Structure formats: C-alpha cells, structure tokens
C-alpha cells in the first residue's frame, strides 16, 4: 500500500541489496522523517529520493528490474541522490562483473543511463606503483574544479574536506563531475545532471562533512 509521502522529507528506495539503516539514521539525526520503501507510487510522489546500494552493479540493477523500478527512477523529477553504488547505477554502464540476471558476468552492466558517464575499475597498475591497496577504503579529500561555484549539494563544504570511501570502481572526471578525489588517479567523487546527483563516498559515515551534505540535500526542492 502506498504511504502518504507528504509527511516524509526523504524516501529511500529499498533496492533489496543495500544496508539501508545507516543512511536512514543519518537523515533522522538531522531531524528528517524518512520512509524506506519499494512502492512505486510512494517513490514517484516523494519530495526527495535516495538511491542506496552496496555490492555489484549487476545484482543491484537486477533487483531494480525485478521490482519494476527502472523506468520509474529514470522519470523522477524531484531531487534524487545516489549513494556509493547508487551513484554508479545512475550512469550509462558499469564494467563491474557480477549479477547473472543481467548477464553481467561476461558483459558490461547496463545501468540507469541518466548521467552520461561510465564506471570502470580504479587503475590497478597506478595503485600498485604508488603502493596503494584496492579497494580504496578510508578517509580522503574532496576537491572542486571551481571552488567559487560549487554545486548546492556541497554548499558550506570546504575544499580539502575529508569523507569516507569504500569502493573499487569509479566514474572518471567529466563535465558531470561535481567534486573530485585522488587515489592513484583523479576520479569523480560526485556527479550530477539536472535533478540527479550521486556521491561515491558514504556521507552517512563522513561525520560533520557528510551531515552538511545530507542537510544540503534536504533543502533541495
């Protein structure tokens, strides 16, 4: 049954393959009313939508397909925030293998196709040369190509601020990069197009900086 979304500040999509509690609690600590659901009517009517995700792109996309949520998400017009794998799912495709339902063990995984960039693995040769392990796990710094004109998602966030990452795949720098980070190579720490935004890091695990970013999202209409 559809919930009355007027009473909720954020609807988190229950993708079936994500640990949703930490994201939910992070918003609730900011005073937000949060609904976690896979109900299509509730998602469509939401004020703001969060797309979380952990695991492989193939498994996550298979779950969205099984729940008949792909076209619905593609057509959303309210602010939408993808977190970690949720960010990667907003792109054209991921080169990450895994997910038999979409035959992603042998082929690139088709994603939601909303933000025109592609996901590939962090450069293992570069990481090895610099003595850096894969996955990229831990705190790292955000930078902005134009610090005087940051995206509203990063209002009040200073260049050089630390956020928490856990990932092996990344979006390259592009015209859709909102913030970047360096780990063996420069990559997109956040991407966006129109009402869709995604962050590769975990704002719910990124202390005060993460809370600022989630708070900025709550202000978006």
Curated annotation (Swiss-Prot):
GO biological process, one term: L-histidine biosynthetic process
Pfam families named in the record: GATase (PF00117)
InterPro entries to which the protein is assigned, alphabetical: Class_I_gatase-like, GATASE, Imidazole-glycPsynth_HisH
Active site location: 84 (nucleophile), 202, 204
Entry's transmembrane regions: none
Chief location category: cytoplasm
EC number: 4.3.2.10, 3.5.1.2
Gene Ontology MF terms in the entry: glutaminase activity; imidazoleglycerol-phosphate synthase activity; lyase activity
Keywords recorded for this protein, A-Z: Amino-acid biosynthesis, Cytoplasm, Glutamine amidotransferase, Histidine biosynthesis, Hydrolase, Lyase
Keyword hit for Protein transport: no
GO cellular component entries: cytoplasm
HAMAP family, alphabetized: HisH
Assembly with partners or alone: Heterodimer of HisH and HisF.
Function: IGPS catalyzes the conversion of PRFAR and glutamine to IGP, AICAR and glutamate. The HisH subunit catalyzes the hydrolysis of glutamine to glutamate and ammonia as part of the synthesis of IGP and AICAR. The resulting ammonia molecule is channeled to the active site of HisF.
Protein name: Imidazole glycerol phosphate synthase subunit HisH
Species of origin: Shewanella oneidensis (strain ATCC 700550 / JCM 31522 / CIP 106686 / LMG 19005 / NCIMB 14063 / MR-1)
Gene: hisH
């Amino acid at each position: 049954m559809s919930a009355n979304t007027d009473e909720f500040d954020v609807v988190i999509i229950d993708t079936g393959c994500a640990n949703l509690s930490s994201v939910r609690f992070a918003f609730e600590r900011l005073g937000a009313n949060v609904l976690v659901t896979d109900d299509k009517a509730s998602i469509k009517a939401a004020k703001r939508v969060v797309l979380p995700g952990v695991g492989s792109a193939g498994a996550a996309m298979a779950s969205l397909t099984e729940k008949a949520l792909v076209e619905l998400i593609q057509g959303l017009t309210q602010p939408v925030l993808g977190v970690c794998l949720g960010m990667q799912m907003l792109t054209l495709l991921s080169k990450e293998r895994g997910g038999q339902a979409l035959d992603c063990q042998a082929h690139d995984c088709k994603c939601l196709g909303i933000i025109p960039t592609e996901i590939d693995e962090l450069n293992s040769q570069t990481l090895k040369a610099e003595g850096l392990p894969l996955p990229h796990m831990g705190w790292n710094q955000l930078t902005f190509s134009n610090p005087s004109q940051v995206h509203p998602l990063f209002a009040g966030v200073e260049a050089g601020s630390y956020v928490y990452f856990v990932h092996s795949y990344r979006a390259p720098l592009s015209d859709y990069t909102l913030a970047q980070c360096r780990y063996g190579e420069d990559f997109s720490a956040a991407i966006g197009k129109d009402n869709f935004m995604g962050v590769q890091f975990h704002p719910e695990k990124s202390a005060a900086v993460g809370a600022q970013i989630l708070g900025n999202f709550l202000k978006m209409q």
